[in-house]
């Protein structure tokens, strides 16, 4: 066991995989840099951003401004867009050479593909969809995530293996304020690819031309649950949202019923949101839903059941029938906003 302990001491610093698409750094990477900064400060270590892409080095300074001390940049045609094998090879090489203590990855479609590959190749643990990350007294990473269908929060530790790896959904962590004066270093990496393992080639990318709204970006959300009932009920929520320049979102029940699309779902199996104002309309407040919205700045809940758990997190609660309350609220807000 002494060898394990000796081994662990060789690993240090908090690394963040910086996801980029079409040369644009994704918001989840900026959020993870904010969390990495907190973790590294409590360990007295550095934050290292790992940026993979092609002709992408100009993004390094932005990563320093958001909390990175070092940016490792691999600039290669092989990395122009995400393909599993080249990306997995590149990061595996970085980890073997640099020995990070912690690696954080966004739980996006890319991160969910990359994380398990790295975990297998590096023979270390991976905790997916973490909602909390902290450092223990033993300097281990405490990774908290919902377990047993979200009815329990489990804190997981990767005691004997390094790096400690975690994926985190977009919107869960808070980004740091951008500081243009932060100083950091940028290092260009040379990746030795084993191209014989490259089995996949991207021939074409076809983007879905849909007028999709990203509810994680909304300042005000009007969210409907089972109590709203049907499409007609959601049309009333749309009206209410219109008076506040808000977006409409929903609980899982309404997505399962086919009334709302999945990209509007708030909760553990949907999106995590932090708007300034969140209306929970006819939502009882299952723990899975709360996990996706309880960090909202101000929560207004309307529910017929005065014992509904949603009232435990609401700043303002109205016990009443959503179908009656929403039109009254819409009328009142429309009058106020006209003023």
Describe each region flagged by the PLM:
Residues 1-339:
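N-terminal glycine-rich FAD/FM-binding segment characteristic of electron-transfer flavoproteins
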């Amino acid at each position: 066991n002494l060898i394990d302990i000796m081994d662990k001491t060789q690993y240090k610093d908090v690394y963040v995989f910086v996801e980029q698409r079409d040369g644009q750094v994704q918001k989840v990477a900026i959020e993870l840099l904010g969390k990495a900064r907190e973790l590294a400060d409590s360990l007295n270590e550095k934050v290292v951003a790992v940026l993979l892409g092609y002709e992408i080095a100009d993004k390094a300074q932005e990563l320093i401004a958001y909390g990175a001390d070092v940016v490792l940049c691999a600039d290669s045609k092989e990395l122009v867009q995400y393909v599993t094998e080249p990306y997995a090879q590149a990061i595996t090489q970085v980890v073997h050479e640099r020995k990070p203590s912690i690696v954080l990855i966004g739980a996006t479609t890319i991160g969910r593909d990359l994380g398990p590959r790295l975990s297998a190749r590096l023979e270390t643990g991976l905790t997916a969809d973490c909602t909390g990350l902290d450092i223990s007294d033993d300097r281990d990473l405490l990774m908290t995530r919902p377990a047993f269908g979200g009815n329990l929060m489990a804190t997981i530790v990767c005691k004997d293996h390094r790096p400690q790896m975690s994926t985190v959904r977009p919107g869960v962590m808070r980004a740091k304020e951008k500081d243009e004066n932060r100083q950091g270093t940028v290092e260009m990496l040379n990746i030795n690819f084993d191209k014989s393992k490259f089995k996949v080639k991207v021939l074409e990318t076809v983007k879905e031309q849909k007028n999709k709204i990203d509810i994680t970006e909304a300042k005000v959300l009007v969210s409907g649950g089972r109590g709203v009932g049907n499409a007609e009920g959601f049309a009333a929520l749309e009206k209410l949202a219109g008076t506040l320049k808000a977006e409409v979102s929903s609980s899982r029940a309404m997505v399962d019923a086919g009334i709302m699309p999945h990209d509007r779902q708030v909760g553990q199996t949907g999106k995590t949101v932090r708007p300034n104002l969140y209306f929970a309309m006819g939502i009882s407040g299952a723990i899975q839903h709360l996990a996706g919205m309880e960090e909202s700045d101000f929560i207004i809940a309307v529910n017929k059941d005065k014992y509904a758990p949603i009232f435990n997190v609401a700043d303002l609660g109205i016990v009443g029938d959503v179908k009656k309350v929403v039109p009254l609220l819409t009328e009142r807000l429309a009058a106020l906003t006209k003023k």
